[in-house]
Each structure stands twice: as C-alpha cells, then as structure tokens.
Design a protein with these regions (language model features):
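Conserved beta-strand positions in repeat-built beta-propeller and related beta-rich domains
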Residues: 45-50, 88-95, 130-134, 175-179, ...
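Hydrophobic, well-structured mid-protein blocks that either form specific transmembrane helices
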Residues: 98-156
Length: 246
C-alpha cells in the first residue's frame, strides 16, 4: 500500500515555480496582437493576429520601431512564427494554411497546409515545433513541413492544454498557456513539464487594455543569452532573468 501511495505521489508531482527578475524593459506597439515572437540577428520578428490586422514584422528592440512589415491579407488570422534557414514560417488560426517568407525581403515564397488550428511555432535548428491549442506539440520536418511525431505535454499525470506561443531556450521549449500569465518549461524529448514561471505581476492590470491582453510572446537572443517576453497589446517588452531554483 505504501509503495502504491508513493507511486501516485511521484506521478502527480508538480514542478516548482521558478522566480525571475526584470533586467530591462523596451517599448512595444500597443496595437500589436502578438502571436509569434522571435529574436534573430539583432532584430525581433513578430507575427500579429486578428483578421484585417494580422502582420509579419521586423522590429528594432531598443526603439520599438517597425523597420519591415508584411500585412497578411484577409480573411487570415495570423498566428505563430519561426525563423529557420533564411525563411520565416507563419501559421494562421483556423484557415489550416501557413505562409513561408524570405527572411531578408519578406517576399511571400509559398504556402502550406495542416490539419486543425495553428497557434505557436519554434525550432531547434533542425526541426519545427508547432502548437495547436491542445496539450500536444507537433514536430515537423522543415524541408517538407510534414509531421514527424507528436509530443503530449504533461505536468505529472495532468495534460497541459492551451499551449500557445513557443520558444526554444537552452534545450527546452518554453510555452505560453492561453489566457494565463504563466510560462511552462517543457522537455522536447518526452513532453515532461520541467517547471513553471508566473509572470502575472510583470505588467499591472492598469496597463492592460482589456481581458485579451494576456502574456503571449517569448523570444530568446542566443548570442547575448537574453530572454524577452511580452503580451498581446502590451506597451512593453521585458527582458527577464530566471533565478536559480531554491
């Protein structure tokens, strides 16, 4: 009996929340309904959503200035993006259509299709990871955009659903969870939740324009080891440093 109870306890164990500190803040476009967020070669690449307002942007982090932009045509609702091999991939929400752009010119190179909804994207340099609002992450071959496998994300025995914007950071996948201000740290090998980061206090309610203005945007500057976070319609981007677990 003791061993059975011990097994249940271990199986249901929830990883500890990890603390953070704000290093610096940067300006962010208050009209950007952020759905995709990556940092490459000194610039932010941001995908925004809403029909008629969806876009792909190249942004100067320090000034917040949009230096390059492609407006996604209606009726598409832009979602997550990822930058790989001089190309930018962008999902759409319910149209089952994604777009491929040339990284330098933002020229639309082509499109691709997938089943279900498109939410978030990231890559590890070799494979693309995609979220669809469930507890599963799809792993794609970037050359063919065909699915290789799926990963079910679990915190103990509980599946973590509504996985949204993604970022590959130091060998882990960091994921926003829709309608929360929490980030979950995920093992890409087996989907195990390695920890949580609660950012509910990083931006006051007074600075948020409404209930849809939730945390959604994680970007990692690998060259400088900087972790950046923002949210939909947020006025700021925050550089944060994760604190060692106690």
């Amino acid at each position: 009996m003791f061993l059975c109870l011990l097994c249940l306890f271990v199986a249901g164990f929830s990883p500890q929340e990890q603390g953070y500190r704000v290093v610096k803040s940067y300006p962010h476009d208050r009209d950007a309904f952020t759905q995709g967020f990556e940092f490459r070669d000194g610039f932010l690449y941001e995908g925004t959503g809403l029909v008629g307002r969806s876009s792909l942007r190249k942004v100067n982090l320090d000034t917040g200035q949009v230096v390059q932009r492609f407006d996604v045509p209606q009726p598409f609702f832009g979602e997550g993006i990822t930058v790989l091999n001089q190309r930018i991939f962008q999902l759409t929400w319910q149209s089952q259509t994604g777009f491929i752009y040339d990284k330098s010119s933002f020229r639309l190179m082509g499109s691709f299709n997938y089943s279900g909804e498109g939410w978030g994207m990231t890559n590890d340099g070799k494979q693309i990871y995609m979220s669809d609002g469930t507890s599963q992450l799809r792993v794609w071959d970037p050359a063919t955009l065909k699915e290789i496998r799926r990963i079910t994300v679990k915190d103990g025995v509980r599946e973590v659903t509504a996985l949204n914007e993604l970022e590959f950071v130091r060998g882990e996948i960091l994921a926003n969870v829709w309608q929360t201000d929490r980030i979950t740290r995920i093992s890409p090998a087996d989907g195990k939740v390695l920890g949580w980061i609660d950012l509910s206090r990083i931006l006051s309610k007074a600075e948020r324009p409404g209930p849809d203005a939730v945390l959604n945007g994680i970007a990692y500057d690998a060259a400088s080891d900087r972790l950046l976070v923002t949210g939909k319609l947020w006025p700021k981007i925050f550089e944060i440093q994760l604190l060692p677990k106690k």
